[in-house]
Amino acid sequence: MPTYITLANFTDQGVRNAKDTLKRAEAFKDLAKKHGVTVKDIYWAQGRYDIVTISEAADEMAATALALSIGGQGNIRTETLRAFSAEDMKTTIGKMA
């Protein structure tokens, strides 16, 4: 399954409710399962982004549906990146002209 890295920032609402972030992370994992997405890791971070997740989804539509669903709750804004493993890159490079 494709791997995705999601970079998230708390909204004002998310910061006001920061004490609930661990509870929301568990709810996120449950929601992800409903979308067919497996959350591999969740990290809280310092710097430009507040949260980083690594997940696997069957396709872009599943990953996008999850991002829209979680964003609609109003606690975070997200940016999702498609990640490629070394094996993926080996295959890609092998297709180069």
Where are these regions (language model features)?
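A compositional/biophysical signature of low hydrophobicity enriched in polar/charged and small residues
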Residues: M1-A97
